[in-house]
Amino acid sequence: MHIIGIRLDGGKENVIKNLQPGWYPFGDFVEPVWENNYEWRKPGSMAENLYQTCDPLPRTISVSCVVGANGSGKSTLLEMLFRIINNFASELLPNSEDYKGRKLTFAEGLDAQLYFETDGTVGSILNKDDYVRYFYGTNKDRQPNEIRDPLRRNYKILDNFFYTISTNYSIYSLNDDDYDSLDIQTGEKSSNEGKWLYGLFHKNDGYLAPITMTPYRQEGGIIDVTNEKELARQRLMTLFLLFESQNKAFINGYRPLELEYCFNQNYKNDTLKIYKYKVRKKLSSSNVDSLINAFSKRWKEIINKEFKCAHNNPIVEETILFYLGYKTLKICMTYESFGRIINIESFSDASFISKEQVNTIIEKIRSLEEDNHITLKINQCLTFLKRGYLAVENPITVNAKEFIKHNLDFDNQFLSSEDKKKTKYDTYDQVFKLLPPPFFFCDMTLHRRVQVSETKKKIKEEIRLSRLSSGEKQMLFNLSYVIYHIKNIQSVKKDEYRMPYRHINLIFDEAELYFHPEFQRSFVSELLKMISWCHIDRRKIRSINIIIVTHSPFVLSDVPLENILYLEDGRHVKKMQQTFSANIHEILQSHFFMKYPMGEIAREVLDRIITLYGKRDEDRERALKDLSDNKDYYYYVESIIADPYLKSTIHRMLNELYSLDETPLQKLHREREETESKLKNIDNQIAELEKDEKN
C-alpha cells in the first residue's frame, strides 16, 4: 500500500494553519484523477525493493519521508491525514462509547481529499467539512461507496482500507487545546474543536476503527509517563526474551541477563479504585464488585478442578482470582461480542446476571477462537498457574537463558514422541504468557556492550531495563509499540463486528526525538528488521507503508528522492538532488533548508575574521588595531576550527593580516613559534597513543 497524497482545497484557519491549497504528495507522485487514468507514479519504480531486506516482510513495504523547517506545515499535514481518517471512521462505524471503549467525534473545518493505494487499486476519501465520501477503484467502476448503518453493511469497505499507527512523543504536539479559539476579552474558550483527538488515543476497541495514536494523551495533550513506562517494560521484556530464545538481539548491543519479579500486595485495592473511577458513568461501584465476584467465583471453580493448585497465602490467592474476574469484566466492557452476552450496554443490576451467562463468557474467553490479544493477559495468568509459580511472597531473580530453557522443557514434556521438540519461541504471545502477570513488580537486567575507547574492544556492562537512558528508552519504546500493534492486528479474526485489516500505515512524527546520531542512522534498518521478526503472515498483512517526519539527515539518507515530500512555508516544493546514501553534510544543506552548514556563533566568529581580511587594504589602520587588540583570541579561534580546509583558509588570512605590520625578522619569529606549537601538539598525541597501547 501507499499513502499517495492529499489534495487540500481549503478549511478553517485553525485547522489548515499555514498550509496553502494544493497537492501534497508523499513522494514524487501525481494526483490520480480520471484525466490521467488514475496513474500516480512513474512506471518502473523500484523504490520498494530497497526495503525487502528480510524474507518474512510483507510483499510490499514502502518508506517515505516528510521534510521541512520548523513551521513549514509538516505536523499540520499529518493532522489533516488523521482528521480525514477519523471522519471516515466516525461515519462508517457505530459510535457506541460503551462498546468500543472510545467515542469518535467528527472533526469539521477541512476541505480535502486523501488518496491511497492498496493491492494495486487507487482509493480516496473526500472530506468537505461535514460531508464524507469514499471511493475505491478506477475508471468505469470508480463510484462513491455509500457509508451506511449498520456496520455489517459497511465493514466490507474496510477490507480494502488500511490501519494507521502513529507515534509522536513531542510534549507540544496533538494538544486538544491548540484547536480551540480563545476570547481575549473574557479569557474563555469559544469552542472545543480539539475533542476529536480523544478518540484516536484509545486503543481498546479491538482494532475496529482504522487508526490509533501513541502514546496515549490525556486532556491537554498530557502523557502519563509512568503508565507508558510500565506498559513499555512489559512489551520490552517479552521481546528481549523472544529474540533471546532465537539467539538474536532485539536491539544490537543489548541482551537479557536476568528477570526479576516481586508480588504486589496492594494490586487489588489500587486497581479496583482506579477502575471504579473510570467506569463510574457506566457501572455503579456495587455492580463492579458484584460482576467481578461472579466472574472470580467461576474462575476459582475452574482453577481448583483443572489446575489442582492451591496457595498457602490468602492474599496471593485473592489477588489472582480478583485479577481474572477484573480482566473478564474489562473484556465485556470493551468488546461487543462479549458484552452483549450480559447486555452490558444497558446493564443496571448485577443481581440479574445468571450463572449461564457467566459460564458462556468465560468459556468464550477460553476458546481457541479467542486466543488473541483480547484474552492474552487472562491466558498469561492461567499459564502462570499451570507452571506452578506459587512461591511468590519473596522477590525472585532468574537467569534469562535458564528461564527460557525451563519453559521450553515444560512445554516439551507434553509432546508426543512423534512431535518435534521446541527449541525456541516463535511469537510474541508465546513469550508474553510466560511472564509474571501484572500483579507483580517486574524488571529485567540487560547486558549492554560499551565501547570504552577507539583503541579498545567493547566490553559488557549490566544495566536494568528501568535504568536505560531516555534515548535508549525512546528507541525501544517506539519500536516495541509498532511490533505490539502489528502482532495484535494480525491476530484479529473476522466476525459480524470486526473486519481484519490487511494493510498497515506506520507514521513516525519527529522520529529522531531523543536519538543519538547512531540511533538515527540505523532507525530505518532496525525498524525493518524488527518488523521481519514479527513473523508476519503475508496472507493476513499484505503491505506496510511507513511515513517518517524527520529533521535527521541520517534518516533521509536511507530514502530515495522519489519518496520524499518537501515543505517550505506551507507549500510543497521540489528538490532535484538525490538523497539515498548521500553525504550527510550535503543533505543537511541541500534538503533541510539550512542557510549555513555550521552553528551561528561559529559563523559569526569566522565572518568577523573574513570581513577584517576583506577590508585590510581600504582600512589598514583599523585592521592593525583589531589584530593588536585580539591577537591571542584569533590564534585561539584558528586552533579550534575542526574543518581542515576552513582551518587552512583562516590560517592563510590571519598570516596575511599579521604581515601588514611585520618586519621580515618578526615574520620568521612568528612562523617559528607556530611550528614549535605544532610539534608540541604532535608530541602530546604520540604520548597519548603510547599510553593507550600499554594499557
PLM region spans:
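Conserved small-residue
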Residues: 14-26, 30-32, 37-52, 56, ...
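Intrinsically disordered or highly flexible coil/loop and linker segments, enriched in small
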Residues: 171, 222, 474, 491, ...
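Short alpha-helical "patches" and their helix-cap loops
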Residues: 98-101, 106, 492-503, 600-617, ...
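Short, flexible/disordered secondary-structure transition segments
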Residues: 91-92, 224, 489-493, 534, ...
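Coupling/switch/interface segments within P-loop NTPase motor domains and analogous charged loops
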Residues: 2-5, 105-109, 115-460, 612-695
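Short alpha-helical segments and helix-capping/turn motifs at coil-helix boundaries
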Residues: 93, 99, 195-200, 550-551
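C-terminal lobe/lid and adjacent interdomain/linker elements of RecA-like ASCE P-loop ATPase modules
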Residues: 522-667, 672, 677, 683
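Switch/communication elements of ASCE P-loop NTPase nucleotide-binding domains
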Residues: 6-86, 446-591
